[in-house]
Amino acid sequence: MRLAIRHISRYQFDDQATHALQRLRLRPQSGPGQTVRAWQVTIEGVEPALSYTDGLGNRIDLVRHDRGAKNEIVVVAAGVVETQDRAGILGNPEGYAPPWIFERETELTKAGDTVRELTQALPIEPHSLDALHWLMTEVHGRIAYAPNLADAPVDAETALQSGEGTSRDHAHAFIAAARALKVPARYISGYVLADSAMQRIADAKQSAAGDEPEEALALQSGDGMQQALGASHAAQSQGLPQAALGAQPQAAALMQQPAGHAWAEAYVEGLGWVGFDPFMNRCPDERYVRIAVGLDYRDAQPVTGLGASAVGVEISVVQSPELV
């Protein structure tokens, strides 16, 4: 599938700020399941002061904005990515960080009593692929979609206790539980082509939480063991049926998640890294584009910095028949 993506972020200088510094994680990289055909990050009137690859393999741009006569900063990331459905399996691509790095707890993924209660309810062997599918389904059912939560992330324990959150919180809860089971797990930020299944889940989660659905933003080869595990996993990884993409000249409305979409990946012996989207209760397929990876949201946040505050984000993901 060929996806055309456009991500526009707007910021205003803070009072008294003479300049702003930003770290951008807005460049997808080619790898298992995705090939970047064209991509550009444009910052009005500014060139990145430094671009590099961090210790987790993310492409980073560092930018300084001098206030001058302007009060707004506009950052545009756009391009075309070709994707393949690998049933969520990335395998063991060459990378910067070994799997054991992602067993480490963070403030946002620390296992408390609620996370441990979830892992203790696991009915099967904890290091199996089936256990991770069970965990994904449990997190999906325990956290209702709440698009109007504050932008500041909450930790996994709080998300499970409150029973509401966004895809970011679903990912943190899954990661915390997986790490409590001694399974390496990491946070992924990226984009997803929304479909009717995604909208139905958002509506159902809102209804279950007692909220009225709100108007969404219109944005948005291995050895024998690996092959056998992969075949079993592929049968489990299918989510709700996808709407006919050919009938969607524009992307379906993506729920109000200002930073795009988030999911998790866990390391499975014999398969390598495997993606799990507990928000959608499915494994990532050709509708997903990975942008950044981290121990949690803070490592993979699209834009961080000082001296300016976000005032608006627009994200569109559209199936494209040609390069744009």
Roles of regions detected by a PLM:
Residues 12, 16, 23-25, 101, ...:
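Residue-level preference for alpha-helix termini and adjacent loops
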Residues 137, 169-312:
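Hydrophobic/aromatic-rich core segments of domains that either
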Residues 71, 302-324:
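A short, charged
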Residues 1-117, 218-245:
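Linear, non-domain "peripheral" regions
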Residues 81-85, 90-165, 181, 206-210, ...:
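Secondary-structure boundary elements
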Residues 18, 22, 31, 105-107, ...:
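Short capping/connector residues at structural and topological boundaries
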Residues 24-26, 41-43, 77, 119, ...:
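Generic structural hydrophobic/aromatic packing signal, biased to beta-strands
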